[in-house]
């Protein structure tokens, strides 16, 4: 559904313009209603509202007596912020979430199928280079589901 890497500028009010190639799809999919929350990798995750609602239902079913499950719910649901594309195709990135991900003027929007990741551009470039080096060096263990993947 969503793919590609798009460098974007954040304006002085903390807004980012959604690339034009995604705007129509988002209007059709969710009328421009999105949910933004934290990711454990130091970036933000941006979900179309229907995708977020599915995740939220899964999170709600996690047992509150399990400390890890409760922490996950606190982080993802507690930081969740409703966003809507304005008439110019922009969304406001709340200051608390911009601060969490270290977002300033230059960010990168990364399509991840059913959602987007939003990274500080410098952090993205460093992480991407590290991931490429890991793959080239054959480091890490692939999950069983990926062992037969070929391209």
Residue ranges and their predicted role:
Residues 28-43, 80, 102-119:
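A short beta-strand-loop micro-motif that forms or neighbors metal/cofactor-
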Residues 25, 54-55, 124-128:
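Short, charged/polar, Gly/Pro-enriched secondary-structure boundary elements
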Residues 2-44, 49-50:
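A positional/architectural concept
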Residues 111-137:
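C-terminal end-helix/capping segment
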Residues 49-83:
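Helix-adjacent hinge/juxtasegments
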